[in-house]
Each structure stands twice: as C-alpha cells, then as structure tokens.
C-alpha cells in the first residue's frame, strides 16, 4: 500500500473569510458533507473554493507564489466522490498519480491548457483514494529530480563516497583473491567489453584518476579501472532502485515499495532482497520482461561483507526519502534525470577523457524536430547508438503530445504504439540500462495500461547489423522500412 506515515497531521487554516479544512504541505483538502458533490452546481462551487484556497495559500510564499501554486494540489471530497485541482502556468494536460477506475480513454475531450485543471469528480474507490494518498505522501517526500538526487548521492556526500569506497575495495579484493571467482569474472568481462566501448581512451583518462579519487574521498594511488567499475556499479544500483520503485507504484498500487523497510533487515536479509532485485524477478513480476539482461553490476553480492551491507543500507535509506510518483506528477522534472546524475557521479575531466559527451535535452528536442518526427502512429523512431536514451525520451514525449491533440485516444493503444515504434541500440551495457530506465520513466503514464512490456532498447552493435536474405533475386532486402526515422 501507500505509506503516508511521514506526512504531518492535518491542520486547519483560515484564509480571509473562508476556512480550509486541512493542509498537508502543498495539499489542500476540502471535506464536504454526504452527497454534497452530487450536483453540477455543487461541483462548480467546490472548484471555485479550491481555486481560492490554493491561490490564497500560495500568497504565503511571497516571491515563490507562482512556483508554490504549481506544486499545490486541491482535493474536495464527500462520502461518495472526490475531485482534484492543479495549476499549470503553461499549457499542459495533467493526470492523477494512478488511473482512476472507469477511465477508458486518454484525456477524453481535453486539450492542453494553462491555469487551473480539474479532474473528476470520481467515485471514491481504491484507485481514487490511492491518488489522494500519493499526493499527501508526495508533499512530505523529496521529488525525484537530478538536483535533489545530487544533494544525497553526489560524490561529495557521505552516502556516495562510503558506498563507492566499499565497492572499490570489494572489486580489488575480488581481483586478488581466489575465493571471489565470480567477482573476478564479472570484472574481466566488464574490462573486455568496456575496452571495446572506450578503446584507447581508458589510457588517456588515467590522468583523471587522482581527481576522481579526491572527489570520492579516496586515497591517492587508486586504480582507475577498478574505481570506474565501482562507480558504474553504484550508478546501476541507483537506477535499479528508481525503476523498481516506479513499477511498484504503477503496476499495482497494492504492491509494496521495494525499499520500504529494507534497510531495517539484517545483513543476510538485505542480501537476499537485493539478490531478488538483481535476478530481475521483481521486474518480471511487475510486467517488465527484459529490464535486466547481460548485467555486469550484480557482482557485489558475491563480495558481501558487513561494511558493504552497511553502505548499501545508507543508499537504500536515502532512496526511500524520494517520491517515485514524480515522473507521473511532474513529468518535466524527470527529463535528463539519469544523464545529469551520471554527470555528477563521473567528473567532467574523466568523462571527456573517455570520450563521453552528452546531448543536452534542448538540443535533442531540436534535432528530433529537424528530423521530422512528430510522434504520429505508424512512423517508427530508431536511435542506433542511443546512449542513455535522451533521443528516445524525446520521441516518447512527442508520441504522447501527438495523442494529446486528438479528441479521444485509448491509453493502451498509445502505449503499445510507442513500444512498437520507439527503439534504440547500444553496445555499452551501462548505457542500455540507463536507456531502459529513462524509457520507463518517460513511459510511466502508460504502464498501468500495457502489460507485459518488453522495453525496445537492445544491447547490440548497430555497426554490424544482422544479415538478411534478399527478398528476391533482384533486390536486397531492406533492413529498415521507409517509415522509420533512423537517428
């Protein structure tokens, strides 16, 4: 279920001549008597009240009035119905955190708009009450944004430097000692494959080793490859936690959070639960068939120690403070999430030494526009070197925006069209994991309606495409159809 134990107890606040029944952070709740939302006139009155309450509450924040208003949620409910209100300063279409039972179409007869948005009234049921509880919980949790993640998981902070230090030590032990053969095997395979990805750039990046070590509060004289292996493992671990929490929310509101209570287990219990995570079974149980494939970053389970368990608990406990519903509540906040997180974890000098340069979100959007892709169904979008999935995310948003312009479009149809039409390849296993996670984040609003899901991001070398037999004696078969935008 949805844990709201962290939310403050409701308080009553009087504004001008009116009274707000309760405020949870930025959530304003107006309680109505039985049957008071049964008529159209009563609903109009409730909307006006919520609008007034939210505007007056936002004035308390002075210069932050408009931004606080965008973060506010108004809720009116009686014994049978519930109504939600949000504000947007730009033209948008807003949705509830989880789909309300009975909704069969995507934004029926709704166009993007700015100002106040009203959703409902909906019947009070499990899904509408879950949305209410998620709004309440979100008011007490940190948003899942790159800036907020950086304040906890950035290398200058304890969670990151303690865990990376322990992972580095574990990787070094695994290479030196025969009792950790799986660690040595994973490292050797990572070294081989990333040698193909980075080529001679790894040697050129050695001069960034000391800077990276200082960033993570490690002593001088570290081995760059082993440190990069540890940082990659840390980054992969964070992505897996983000993805499993998002799926726990979207697949079934009654599926428990993965991280909730995990840090309270003993060392063996934490390892058992993380083994389940790394096996991919948790993702498969939640309808994602291929999230973890050819993953090099579960090796730490074979180098498990008390110190490593303690460091893992620190990261798990910190992740539990973030709201997994952020990609649904505020989709724009989570764009570039993993790219920016990686840029924080791997310093610029090392990234550039490795030849890693990321495309800014605004430039990716511009290039997708110039390529002529508008998200129309029937047109496929392929990025054959997708990296962390920046262009794939842009394509998914274009497809959703195209759907929003229609009068009525069924959510499942849009979601399936995206899965069939937006795909990527990459040779880098870490990039594939990042792209799949970014794909899930961008696809979050469709997850409840499409199952099972196979994320169309594949680990392969697009420079060496598979051979195909000619369709006839005179014509070579086309690898891609004419309606595919190859990026």
PLM regions with names:
Residues 1-73, 81-94, 106:
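A short, conserved, highly charged catalytic patch centered on acidic carboxylates
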Residues 4-13, 329, 333, 341-343, ...:
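SAM-dependent methyltransferase catalytic region
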Residues 17, 38-45, 178, 182, ...:
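Conserved aromatic-histidine-acidic binding/catalytic patches
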Residues 22, 28, 191-219, 334-349, ...:
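Active-site-adjacent bridging/hinge elements
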Residues 57, 61-175, 274-281:
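Mixed-charge intrinsically disordered linker/loop segments at interdomain junctions
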Residues 66-69, 252-265, 448-454:
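Short, glycine/acidic-rich hinge or "gate" loops at secondary-structure transitions
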Residues 142-268:
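DNA-processing P-loop NTPase/helicase core
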Residues 247-344:
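Long recognition/docking surfaces used for binding and targeting
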């Amino acid at each position: 279920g949805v844990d709201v134990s962290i939310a403050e107890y409701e308080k009553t606040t009087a504004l001008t001549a009116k009274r707000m029944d309760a405020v949870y952070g930025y959530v304003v709740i107006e309680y109505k008597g039985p049957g008071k939302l049964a008529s159209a006139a009563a609903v109009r009155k409730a909307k006006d009240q919520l609008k007034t309450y939210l505007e007056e509450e936002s004035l308390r924040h002075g210069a932050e009035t408009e931004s606080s208003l965008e973060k506010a949620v108004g809720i009116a409910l009686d014994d049978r119905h519930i109504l939600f209100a949000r504000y947007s300063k730009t033209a948008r279409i807003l949705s509830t955190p989880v789909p309300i039972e009975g909704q069969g179409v995507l934004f029926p007869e709704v166009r993007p708009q700015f100002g106040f948005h009203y959703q409902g009234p909906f019947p009070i049921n499990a899904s509408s009450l879950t949305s209410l509880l998620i709004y309440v919980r979100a008011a007490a949790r940190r948003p899942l944004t790159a800036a907020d993640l950086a304040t906890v998981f950035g290398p200058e902070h304890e969670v990151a430097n303690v865990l990376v230090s322990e992972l580095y030590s574990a990787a070094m032990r695994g290479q030196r000692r025969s009792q950790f053969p799986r660690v040595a095997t994973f490292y050797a395979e990572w070294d081989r494959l990333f040698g193909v990805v980075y080529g001679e750039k790894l040697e050129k990046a050695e001069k960034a080793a000391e800077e990276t070590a200082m960033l993570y509060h490690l002593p001088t004289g570290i081995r760059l490859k082993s440190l990069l292996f540890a940082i990659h493992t840390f980054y992969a671990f964070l992505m897996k936690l983000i993805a499993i929490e998002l799926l726990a929310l979207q697949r079934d509101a009654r599926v428990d959070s993965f991280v909730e209570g995990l840090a309270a287990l003993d060392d063996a219990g934490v390892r058992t639960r993380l083994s389940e995570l790394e096996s991919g079974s948790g993702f498969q149980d939640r309808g994602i068939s291929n999230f973890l494939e050819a993953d090099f970053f579960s090796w730490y389970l074979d180098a498990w120690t008390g110190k490593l368990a303690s460091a893992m608990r620190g990261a798990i406990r910190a992740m539990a403070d973030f709201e997994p519903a952020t990609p649904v509540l505020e989709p724009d906040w989570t764009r570039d999430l993993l790219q920016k997180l990686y840029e924080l974890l791997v310093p610029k000098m090392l990234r550039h030494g490795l030849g890693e340069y990321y495309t800014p979100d605004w430039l990716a959007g511009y290039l997708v526009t110039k390529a002529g892709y508008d998200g129309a169904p029937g047109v496929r979008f392929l990025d054959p070197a997708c990296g962390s999935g920046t262009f794939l995310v842009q394509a998914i948003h274009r497809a959703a925006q195209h759907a929003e312009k229609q009068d009525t479009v069924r959510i499942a149809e849009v979601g399936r069209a995206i899965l069939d039409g937006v795909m990527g390849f990459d040779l880098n296993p870490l990039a594939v994991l990042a792209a799949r996670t970014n794909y899930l984040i961008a696809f979050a609003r469709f997850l409840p309606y499409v199952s099972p899901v196979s994320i169309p991001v594949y680990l392969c070398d697009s420079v060496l495409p598979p051979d195909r037999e000619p369709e006839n004696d005179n014509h070579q078969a086309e690898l891609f159809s004419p309606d595919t935008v190859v990026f």
